[in-house]
């Protein structure tokens, strides 16, 4: 994976105020108001680790998704950058899985609870263990800066087949 430098910054987008005037009547027919939008970047994470007979490499990086802040400061629109995961798994030094993990892969789990997945983003991935030649990972998908999360267990066998299990969620208590 390529390592991309991540700077401590916040992106700002500005829309310019514009009034459209009819040339026939000199009447304003449209008015576009200026607006400041703040985008909080995602901090990229890279892991390259060996556990048992598995080598796992993954990179969690910022994508083009924009997740709205639940309680932005008054008069501001604030978004968090979303993320995707590049994942590569080797077993006994042979590559068995290369893939991209996107939050949309999990939308059916959210649909069952009537939850709008557009507010959620991939938060983290961590290596848990290896059991019976199966690599076990935990994936967390959350609404940024809240405790609304859904956890998934990803089980990857020595042939690269992945099984997804919902581990725990906050939806059932709602």
Give the positions of each predicted feature.
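Bacterial Sec-dependent N-terminal signal peptides
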Residues: 1-3
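Short, exposed beta-strand-loop hairpins at the edges of beta-sheets
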Residues: 5-8, 141-161
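Short, ordered beta-strand-loop transition motifs
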Residues: 8-9, 79, 128-133
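Surface-exposed acidic loop/strand-edge motifs in secreted or periplasmic proteins
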Residues: 14-124
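A short, structured loop/turn motif at beta-sheet edges
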Residues: 90-95, 126-133, 155-161
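Short hydrophobic/aromatic-rich beta-strand segments that constitute the beta-sheet cores
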Residues: 98, 137, 163-166
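Acidic, glycine-rich flexible loop segments
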Residues: 108-147
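Short, low-complexity, Pro/Ser/Thr/Gly-rich segments in the mature regions of secreted, periplasmic
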Residues: 155-174
């Amino acid at each position: 994976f390529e390592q991309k430098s991540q700077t401590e910054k916040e992106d700002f987008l500005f829309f310019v105020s514009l009034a459209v005037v009819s040339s026939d009547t000199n009447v304003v027919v449209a008015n576009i108001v200026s607006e400041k939008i703040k985008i909080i970047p995602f901090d990229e994470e890279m892991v390259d680790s060996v556990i048992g007979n598995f080598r796992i490499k993954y990179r969690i990086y910022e994508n083009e998704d924009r997740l709205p802040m639940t309680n932005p400061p008054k008069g501001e629109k604030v978004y968090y950058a979303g993320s995707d995961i590049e994942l590569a798994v080797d077993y006994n030094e042979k590559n068995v899985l290369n893939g991209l993990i996107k939050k949309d892969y999990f939308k059916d789990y959210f649909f069952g609870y009537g939850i709008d997945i557009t507010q959620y983003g991939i938060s983290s991935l961590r290596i848990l263990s290896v059991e019976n030649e199966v690599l076990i990972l935990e994936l967390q998908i959350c609404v940024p800066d809240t405790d609304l999360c859904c956890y998934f267990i990803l089980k990857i066998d020595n042939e690269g087949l992945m099984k997804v299990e919902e581990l725990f969620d906050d939806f059932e208590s709602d």
